[in-house]
C-alpha cells in the first residue's frame, strides 16, 4: 500500500494515492489538472482522510499544524512555527504563524486549532463526529493567547506530534465543525486554509477545485510559500482501470491514481512518471479471522504461511513497485522490525504443523 506524498512538479499541490501517474516532469504554471480518480470520496471530515479519495482532496484544501518531511521523516513547522512538550509527553504547546486564514476569511488562530483537536480527540456526539484514530489519551486544550495553544493528555502520548502531520489532522473552520457528519460528505461544506478551495461538485462524479490566490503559508521548509502553480484541479471519478490509463496515454488526463502493474510499462514507455511512495504505516496483507473454525488453530495459519511462496506471487503478478513485505509494518514505519526469517516459504516446515 502506498500513500502520503508530495509531487515537486506541482509545488503547492498535495496528493495521496497508490501507484499514480503524472504527465509532467517540470513545474506547470497555470491551467487545470485533470485528475482521474478510481473512486468517489465518501466523507471529508478530516479524520476520515485515510481513505485515498478523501485524503486526495483534503490534502489540497486543508493545512496541518506540522509537516512530516517524506525524505527525513522529521516533523517540521507548518501552521505551527514551533512547539514544546513536557518530559512525559502529556502536555504539548504550539506557537502558530501569524496571518493564516481559512478560505471564508476567518482566522486560523489558537481558538480554531483548539476546537479542531478537541473535536478530533474527544469527538462530538451532537454532530456525530467521531474521534480520530491517530489521537489517543486526549484530555483537553487551552488557549494561552491568540497564537498559542496547549494540549493535555491523560497518559503519555509520544505519537501526538506526528499525528498533527497526518491527513486526519487537517484544520477546518469553526463553521465546518458545526455541521453534522453526514453533511461533510459534500465537499462544498469543507472550509479549510489550504492552497485550493472547492468551487463545484457533482456528487459521485466530479469535483472542481480552484487555487487560492492569497495562499502564503506552505510548510516552512518548502521553497514555495505562495499560491499553487496550477489554476485548478478537476477530479473525475473513473472506476475502469482501462479508461484511466487510456485517457492518460491519449493526453486526455494529466494525472491518474491506481495504476495496475501490467499497465506500468506502457506508461513509462511514453515518458510518464509513476509515483509509488511506500507507506509509513501497515503493509498490505492477507489476514484470517481467528474465529473462523477452519483457521482457528494457530498451527493451521502457520502452515498456510510457510506453504505460500509470497515471493513468487509478487514477482509473477506485480512489479518492482510492489516489494515483498518483511513485516506487518512497512520498513519506513516507526517501530519496524525485520521479520523475514519468520515469513519464509518452507514446505517442509509447513508439513510439521
Please name every model-derived segment.
Residues 69-70, 74, 165-234, 240-243, ...:
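Gly/Pro-rich hinge or "lid" segments in bacterial periplasmic/extracellular proteins
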Residues 29-39, 81, 91-93, 113-117, ...:
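Short, well-ordered beta-strand elements
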Residues 122-123, 141, 199-210, 236-292, ...:
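Extracellular/periplasmic solute-recognition and catalytic clefts
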Residues 95, 131-178, 195-202:
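Surface-exposed binding/hinge segments that line
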Residues 77, 211-216, 296-353:
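Append "and occasionally in soluble cytosolic enzymes with long acidic Gly/Pro-rich linkers
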Residues 1-10:
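Bacterial N-terminal signal peptides that target proteins for export
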Residues 81-126, 144, 150-152, 294-296:
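Aromatic- and charge-enriched surface segment that lines or borders ligand/interaction sites
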Residues 36-87, 118, 191:
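N-terminal lobe/hinge region of extracytoplasmic solute-binding protein
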Amino acid at each position: 500500500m502506498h500513500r502520503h506524498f508530495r509531487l515537486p512538479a506541482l509545488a503547492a499541490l498535495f496528493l495521496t494515492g497508490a501507484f499514480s501517474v503524472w504527465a509532467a516532469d517540470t513545474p506547470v504554471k497555470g491551467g487545470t489538472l485533470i485528475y482521474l480518480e478510481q473512486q468517489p470520496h465518501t466523507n471529508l471530515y478530516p479524520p476520515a482522510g485515510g481513505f485515498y479519495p478523501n485524503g486526495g482532496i483534503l490534502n489540497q484544501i486543508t493545512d496541518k499544524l506540522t509537516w512530516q518531511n517524506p525524505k527525513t521523516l522529521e516533523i517540521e513547522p507548518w501552521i505551527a512555527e514551533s512547539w514544546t512538550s513536557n518530559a512525559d509527553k502529556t502536555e504539548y504547546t504550539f506557537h502558530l504563524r501569524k496571518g493564516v486564514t481559512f478560505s471564508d476569511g476567518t482566522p486560523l488562530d489558537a481558538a480554531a486549532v483548539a476546537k479542531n483537536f478537541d473535536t478530533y480527540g474527544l469527538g462530538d456526539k451532537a454532530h456525530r463526529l467521531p474521534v480520530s484514530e491517530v489521537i489517543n489519551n486526549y484530555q483537553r486544550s487551552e488557549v494561552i493567547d491568540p497564537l498559542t495553544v496547549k494540549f493535555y493528555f491523560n497518559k503519555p502520548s509520544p505519537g501526538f506530534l506526528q499525528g498533527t502531520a497526518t491527513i486526519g489532522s487537517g484544520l477546518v473552520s469553526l463553521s465546518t465543525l458545526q455541521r453534522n457528519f453526514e453533511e461533510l460528505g459534500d465537499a462544498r461544506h469543507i472550509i479549510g486554509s489550504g492552497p485550493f478551495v472547492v468551487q463545484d461538485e457533482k456528487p459521485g462524479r466530479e469535483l472542481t477545485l480552484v487555487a487560492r490566490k492569497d495562499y502564503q503559508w506552505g510548510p516552512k521548509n518548502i521553497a514555495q510559500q505562495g499560491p499553487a502553480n496550477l489554476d485548478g484541479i478537476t477530479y473525475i471519478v473513473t472506476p475502469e482501470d482501462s479508461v484511466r490509463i487510456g485517457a492518460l496515454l491519449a493526453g486526455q488526463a494529466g494525472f491518474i491514481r491506481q495504476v495496475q502493474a501490467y499497465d506500468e510499462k506502457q506508461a513509462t514507455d511514453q515518458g510518464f512518471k509513476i509515483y509509488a511512495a511506500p507507506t509509513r504505516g501497515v503493509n498490505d496483507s492477507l489476514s484470517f479471522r481467528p474465529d473462523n473454525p477452519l483457521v482457528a488453530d494457530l498451527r493451521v495459519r502457520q502452515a498456510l504461511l510457510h506453504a505460500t511462496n509470497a515471493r513468487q506471487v509478487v514477482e509473477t503478478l506485480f512489479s518492482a513497485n510492489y516489494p515483498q513485505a518483511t513485516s506487518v509494518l512497512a520498513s519506513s514505519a516507526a517501530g519496524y522490525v525485520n521479520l523475514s526469517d519468520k515469513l519464509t516459504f518452507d514446505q517442509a516446515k509447513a508439513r510439521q504443523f
